[in-house]
Amino acid sequence: MGDKMLSKTCRDENFFKVFKELKHSQSLNLPNNNKLEMYYTKIMNNKFDYTALIELLCENITNYVFSRKENLEASEKRKISNLTIKAIKEFRKIKNEDDNGSGGELGEILLYTFLESRLNAFKLLSKMELKTNSSDYIKGADGIYLYEYEDE
């Protein structure tokens, strides 16, 4: 690809304040150079530190839910806080613990954070950008990402 036409949208400067890599020496025994990276949320006082995770997700909610264009327009008009409120409203409300699909959208924003932060796979489109009703749980792909494979 050479020149980068896209850049990542994820604000990931706090990624390693939230996640710690689990080091290992295991191999996947595949013919190519694939590797397995594992992470866990940092632990503070023998408990997972969810506060830092929530902050990381909140820093990225508008970039995940809305397109680059919508984020740029809101930024130029200094209306990012309005866009943040709108983004939060897009998340599906959990009705009860048996609610099908509850919490799935949090998994989607986590996936987005990992893909952009660790793989430099840039978001082209998220499923959230296509939603027309916040109570709907849309099944299927969580998003479309562009990953440039570099042959070693």
What is the role of each PLM region?
Residues G2-K86:
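A structured, charge-rich N-terminal accessory region that forms the first stable segment of a protein
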Residues L53, L83, G107-L111, K139:
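Generic hydrophobic, aliphatic-rich segments that mediate packing or membrane embedding
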Residues Y64-N71, I94, D98, F122:
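Short secondary-structure junctions and interdomain/linker hinges
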Residues K79-N100:
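A short, surface-exposed helix-loop junction/capping segment
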Residues N96-M128:
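Acidic-basic catalytic patches of nuclease active cores, encompassing PD-(D/E)XK
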Residues L124-E152:
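Catalytic centers of nucleases
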